[in-house]
Each structure stands twice: as structure tokens, then as C-alpha cells.
Amino acid sequence: AKAIRYRAPYTTNADFRKAVNNGEIAYNDIHLSQMAQEVRYGFMGKVNVAIIEACEVTPDGKIYLTAAGGIAPTVCRLADQIIVELNAAHSKSAMGLHDVYEPLDPPCRREIPIYKPSDRIGLPYIQVDPKKIVGVVETNWPDEARSFAAADPLTDKIGQNVADFLAADMKRGIIPPTFLPLQSGVGNIANAVLGALGRDKTIPPFEMYTEVIQNSVIGLIREGRVKFGSACSCLLYTSDAAD
């Protein structure tokens, strides 16, 4: 449709990537974590309209986000106008899932007071002036989630090696008997590691950080193996996990 002239900072869409490589779209491949700060500094220009997906919006201007937060708090605060996409594909049970917090920018930034994955320091919604909300568009459009390759003997072995290594360090006293928070990546190897940790009953239930909560994490939460997962977004490719 040639509707995009410029985009930052991240994409996984093959058609978009082709358009960028053909010079049809200007693209800034900055780190995802830097985008909100770049916007606040004004490097991306003025924010006229913010389009925000939500599972609920209230008359007093509370916007409850869906599967991700990202730069939504920043653009909502800076935008002249806000359009809310109220997506019925996301349950209202997602209300309370988010921890909305904007840090100060350098050189005035202070420490972010999070000391364990289950800490909360913000609000479960974005608070905006309701007068800025110029439209609410109702949709029912599930997320397009990419599934990962199924586990195979190689990934299973990698996962088991990591679990054995951590269990051995716990037995040696290097890791305390209560275990420690883990940070997991994304993909079939990360899923294999989490699966092996979940099966090893010598490792107690643990909290974890991850960039994206996937089906494997949801399964471990249901089994009582993961006590809490802290992430930037959810990428769930079955309706059972989403529920």
C-alpha cells in the first residue's frame, strides 16, 4: 500500500524488510530499548497521534494495554491525540498485567527500584487526559504469533546440560538452596532449557526475567515450577496459553 515512509526501531516482517532493502521505506535500526528515550529527546520529531491497542479504556482516561507495553506510555503522554484500538481478542483479564513506569532521562536518571522479578513500581494502566482520546475503534484481531521449531534431540540435550549445570552448582553451594532468578531468551533452545529446568525436581520453583513470555513459560507457571515471570511482552501461539 506504500503507506509507511519511515519506521523505527524493530521489525520481523519479510515484506517490510524487502521494502527497506529496496529503498522504498526509510528505516532506523536502533536498539528497541532506546526508542522511548529517543522519542522523549525529540529525535523522532513531534508525536501528533498515538494509536494504542487496549483491552479496556475507561471514561476517566485509563488505558489498559494488551500483549505488550513498549513505548506506549511515552507516546501517549507526548501525543496531541490518541486513538485507542479496543481489541476484543484480548481478554479483559489482562487488566493489571502491566507495570507502567517511565524512567527519568539522562543525565537525571535514577536507579530503577526493581530488585526481583515480582517487584512492581508503576501503574497497571496508562493514565491520559480523556480529552486527548479522539476515537475508539473496536476490533477482534488475534496477535500473529510465530511458532518455533519443535524440540529435537540436540535442543533437548542442550537444555538438559544447562539444567544439570545449575543443579550441580546448587549442590556445591554456589547457588543457594532457594535458587536464584533466571533470565531466559526466546526460541526453541530457550524453551528446551526451561523444559529441562521444569522437569528437574531438585531445582525449586523460581522467578524469571525474559524479553518475551512464550507458551513454555505459561506451562511452567501452571505446573508451579515458575513462580513469577517478568517480561516486555507476551507471544502466545495457542489459544489455551492465551487464556
Where in this protein do the model-derived segments appear?
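Conserved alpha/beta enzyme-core scaffold
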Residues: A1-D243
